[in-house]
Amino acid sequence: MITLYGFGPAMGLPEISPFVTKAHILLRMAGLSYEADTNLGAFFKAPRGKLPYIRDDGEVVSDSTFIRFHIEKKYGFDFDRGLSAAERATGWALERMCEEHLYWLMIDVRWLDDRNFRAGPSKIFASLPAPVRPLIEAYVRRTMRRTLHLQGLGRHDPAARLELAKRDFVAISGILADKPYLFGAEPHGADATAGAFVVGALAEGVVAPLRDAACSMSNIVAYVERITRRFFPTSGG
């Protein structure tokens, strides 16, 4: 049995972390049975101090991309089946854009804006004892702000960050065009990543120009609905 460790639902999302959402999609895309563990204690036991990770018959695999590699190697499932070399390369580049660029812009919106933090990320800490909860929240948010600054995007003003986010959404929208999924009628590996991130960007309760930018692109909105309907038909947070 496979166990996937994550944070759990919030903001109308099946899972608040786009990386954990990606892992859910990968497992479901591969048709593998698994159970989800959203106990916060799993975070403190994470091999690299981050979620997601899986436990598969005693073997622990952390990081959503390495979870994908594990599925491909152990279960023989090709997430890019039928794609050309150029499409595979495009998919990989798009995944890196989502995970190394768009992710940080979403961190800014979710974690550093007080209203959005209360609507979503704060729920991660709900199981902590009340006396220490605000202290831990404040520490984590300071860490996020410092990391965003070190990463580079935190050095830009809000207008510049929004312009960069718009470029990411335009790229996703352009590749998607009028297709159901990024590369055609069926989802592939890149859809697990891009799908997870745009689903997260359109989360309920988020008030931000970044969300408005994504919502202004009709094919992205339809894509979110399609991903949610296919992989999370009974979701809710």
Segments the model singles out, each with a brief description of its role:
Residues 219-226:
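Intrinsically disordered, low-complexity polar regions and short flexible loop motifs
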Residues 104-219:
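GST-like fold's C-terminal all-alpha helical module
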Residues 26-29, 70, 164-175, 226:
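Amphipathic alpha-helical segments that form well-ordered structural scaffolds
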Residues 227-237:
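C-terminal helix/juxtamembrane-tail motif
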